[in-house]
Structure formats: structure tokens, C-alpha cells
Design a protein with these regions (language model features):
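Short, glycine/proline-biased beta-turn/loop segments that scaffold the active-site neighborhood
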Residues: 198-226
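Beta-lactamase-like hydrolase cores
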Residues: 131-177
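Active-site-adjacent helix/loop patches that line small-molecule binding or acyl-intermediate pockets
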Residues: 225-317
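Structured C-terminal helix/loop/strand segments within mature extracytoplasmic catalytic/sensor domains
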Residues: 24, 132-150, 322-438
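Exposed beta-sheet edge and beta->alpha loop/turn motif
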Residues: 94-143, 424-433
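Active-site SXXK
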Residues: 178-207, 409
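Short, low-complexity N-terminal intrinsically disordered segments enriched in polar/charged residues
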Residues: 23-48, 137
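Short solvent-exposed beta->alpha transition segments
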Residues: 43, 48, 53-96
Length: 438
């Protein structure tokens, strides 16, 4: 599911930063006569991360609206807990004086940071993105230990994929199913690509945007039934995890077809995803407006659940979703979600690649999840993530530049008792990807 996905990603991937004044190299020193807005804001980032500079003095109102101070502090506290305090900014570079990259050194690692400084008069930061961490003498064992220490439950798999074979390189709880949020949309993409390969549909087919949903970055406030192509829906569903696009495709393709594709792709417990819920149906059942239906749904078998969904189609709609209930913390992530194990995701990625669909692979690669630095060792890098309160999942499919081999890196973290830290988890996955690239 994706209740807070975009905001959480904004708080980590829109974390654009700058280096510390005391440690800034001469080219970006804030006192330099030729210092730019980027240089000046970069020179303050260590103090911002360490809590020594006021949040509203550094970030523009647009950033503050997307990432409130409390969330920013929670996120940076997680980074500091994992990597130590920020100590220096290095290798700061901007081509235009406003947007650029830098390395932010912590006590236990180095982060790659993308920073956008605004214009006059105050030049406050409008974008901040930490794209990954490097750690000296890193290893799969070290990352595995840190993943094991996360509160709740977590698992991961790093594997070479060759044809239909999965060759694990490093793993923990890879056969255990986790709630994976919007990662379920890979099954929708797989079925769409399969139907197009079979000649049933074309990527250029135009269909109405028949179903709207929450957390829809692309289709928010769009008129219902706006005509769009199937390729556009797929691109939106994968690259920005648009829920309206996903629900439109689920209704178009049909639950039965997607469920059959999920089974064929090797999901180890497909009953947990049967019936295959739309995002609106899941939101509605998780919320406070359908407490009676939720109890019946979670207690029922597949047939009973399908009957309940079909029989309440006129009730389980966007207008009846209680959004307020999602503000406090995790909601029924063990029983009302979409589920897959790291092994399941690896098999799904194999199934998707087997389609030979240029369009499906391109959709996966629009947003690689970890930024350009993490992607540099890969000639292809596709990504799909998922999140809601208490749930984080990140899955990548890459072809290594060095030898042309294909790899899957996938990890999931669930905590039914508390929200999970996007920045910490993304850093761990970035390290797994970097180790797989070697």
C-alpha cells in the first residue's frame, strides 16, 4: 500500500543538502567572494543535520510543507543513529550555482547528496536528496547484521538471475512473506505486459482513467474518465506509484487475470493476495468506516473475501475512505496488505524480464529509486518500492556494466507497532546494491 509513500520519499529523497562551513573546501566555502547560493547552503548542511541550525532558516516553505520539521528530525535522527554525526562536506559541485551534488561525511559513512538552493532573496533550500551511503570495509554480513537489528521484522535477497534461475549471494528470511505495499504493482505490470505480448492489447490503446485513489502523484485531481494510454498508466503506476493508475489497470485487466499471473510468477502464498485488492478497497477496509466489514474480510477464506468485496463494490469507494485513521501508525499490516517474500520478488522480476517488453522495462527504469550515483555501475537499473505506515519495501533489477550479469536486490521491513524509517532503510538497500555491483 502507499498511504504515506510520496511524503515519506519526499522526506528522504527530497532531502537536498549542503556541506559544513568549517569543513568546506575552498571552492565552495561560504566566505568565498564567488560563493553561490549552492555553496552557501552546502556550507551549512552539517549544522542542519546535527540540529545546530534552525529548520525554517534553511528550508524554503515548499520543502517545509512537503517535509514537516518533526518528520525531518525523525529521519535525520535515524541517519545519525546508524552512521554517527555529520562531520564534513566534501566534493561539492554545482554547474549553475543552485543545484548540485556533494559528499556528506558522517562518523561511520559517507552520503551522496543532491541539493537545490532557491533564488533570491533568501536562497533557502527547496530540494534535498540523500541518494545512498558508502561505508568503509562494507560487506553483506555487515549490512545483514544491521537489517537484523531493525525493530520489527525484515528480510532481503541479493541474487544473480540467469534465465529462470535465482542464485543467492546474500539473504536473510528470503522465503518469508512481508507486507510490500505498492510493490504489488509489479504483478499488474507483468499481466499487462503479458496481455500485450499475446496481442490482446497494445501499449498505445487509449482507455478512460476509470478509478481515482489517494496518494496519486500523477492523477491527483484529474477528471474521472480522462483518456490515457496503457503505457502512460503503466509509467505512472511504476515510476511515481500512482494509485489511480494502478486501480484503473486492475479493473481493466481483471482480478482473476492478475491473480493467475501472480501464481504463474511463483508467489509462494497467493491466497494472501486473493482477492487481489485495489488500493481504494484496501484503504477502505483499513479505515474506521468499515470496521464490521474488516472483521468479516480478515476472518474469511478466499471465496468469502471475494464475495464480500463484490457485494460491497458500491460502498468500498474513494468517497467512503476515512483518511484520518491513517495518521496515527500502522493499520492491520499483517492481514490487510499485499504480500511477497524476497524470493517471490526475484521470481517476479524474472517473469517480467522474460516478457521481453521494452516498454515494461522502461517503466521500471524511469525512477531507479536510489539516484544517479547508485545507478552508475549498472547499464540498466529498474525499481519499484512500496510503503505505508509500518511497511517499507524496495526492489531493484539491474544489469551490471562490468560483465552484463543481471541481479535482483530486494528487501522489506515491517513493524506492526510503529512507523519505519525510510532514510535508514534506503541507505541499507543502497549498500546492498553497491556490494552487488562489485
Amino acid at each position: 500500500m502507499k498511504t504515506m509513500m510520496l511524503v515519506l520519499l519526499a522526506s528522504m529523497t527530497v532531502l537536498h543538502g549542503s556541506p559544513a562551513l568549517a569543513h568546506q573546501p575552498p571552492a565552495a566555502n561560504a566566505s568565498s567572494q564567488n560563493a553561490t547560493a549552492f555553496d552557501r547552503r552546502a556550507a551549512e548542511l552539517v549544522d542542519v543535520i546535527n540540529g545546530n541550525m534552525a529548520f525554517d532558516a534553511y528550508f524554503a516553505p515548499t520543502f517545509q510543507a512537503a517535509v514537516p520539521e518533526a518528520r525531518f528530525k525523525t529521519m535525520t535522527a535515524g541517519i545519525v543513529a546508524q552512521y554517527g554525526r555529520a562531520v564534513a562536506a566534501e566534493s561539492a559541485h554545482s554547474a549553475d550555482g543552485h543545484s548540485g551534488t556533494l559528499k556528506l561525511r558522517f562518523e561511520k559513512g559517507v552520503a551522496t547528496v543532491l541539493l537545490d538552493a532557491g533564488g533570491a532573496p533568501d536562497e533557502r533550500v527547496t530540494g534535498l536528496r540523500i541518494t545512498g551511503f558508502t561505508v568503509a570495509d562494507d560487506s553483506f554480513a555487515r549490512v545483514s547484521g544491521e537489517i537484523a537489528a531493525l525493530p520489527g521484522t525484515a528480510g532481503f535477497l541479493v541474487a544473480e538471475v540467469d534465465g529462470d534461475s535465482v542464485r543467492p549471494i546474500a539473504a536473510a528470511h528470503a522465503d518469508r512473506q512481508f507486507a510490500v505495499g505498492s510493490t504489488f504493482k509489479l504483478y499488474v505490470l507483468d499481466e499487462l505486459a503479458a496481455e500485450i505480448a499475446a496481442g490482446k492489447r497494445r501499449w498505445s490503446d487509449v482507455v478512460p482513467l476509470s478509478h481515482l485513489s489517494f496518494s496519486s502523484a500523477a492523477t491527483a485531481n484529474w477528471p474521472k474518465d480522462t483518456p490515457v494510454t496503457l503505457q502512460t498508466l503503466a509509467n505512472w503506476m511504476i515510476s511515481v506509484s500512482d494509485n489511480g493508475a494502478a486501480d484503473t489497470l486492475i479493473h481493466l485487466l481483471g482480478r482473476d487475470a492478475i491473480e493467475a499471473r501472480m501464481r504463474a510468477a511463483g508467489n509462494s502464498d497467493p491466497s494472501r493476495n486473493t482477492p487481489f485488492l485495489t488500493t481504494v478497497e484496501a484503504f477502505a477496509l483499513k479505515g474506521n468506516n468499515f470496521t464490521d466489514l474488516r472483521g468479516k474480510f480478515t476472518a474469511g477464506d478466499d471465496a468469502a473475501q471475494r464475495k464480500l468485496i463484490d457485494g460491497n463494490a458500491d460502498k468500498l469507494i474513494l468517497g467512503n475512505v476515512d483518511g484520518v485513521s491513517f495518521t496515527a501508525g500502522p493499520r492491520f499490516i499483517d492481514s490487510l496488505e499485499w504480500f511477497a517474500s524476497p524470493d517471490d520478488i526475484a521470481r517476479l522480476m524474472i517473469d517480467l524480464r522474460r516478457r521481453g517488453s521494452e516498454q515494461a522495462m522502461a517503466a521500471l527504469a524511469i525512477n531507479n529509486g536510489l539516484g544517479p550515483v547508485a545507478a552508475e555501475p549498472w547499464s540498466y537499473l529498474g525499481y519499484k518500492g512500496g510503503s505505508e505506515n509500518g511497511v517499507l519495501s524496495m526492489s531493484l533489477l539491474g544489469q551490471r556494466k562490468a560483465d552484463g550479469k543481471w541481479f535482483v536486490v530486494t528487501a522489506s521491513w515491517n513493524n506492526a507497532d510503529a512507523n519505519v524509517d525510510t532514510a535508514v532503510f534506503s541507505g541499507l538497500v543502497a549498500r546492498l546494491l553497491a556490494l552487488a555491483a562489485k
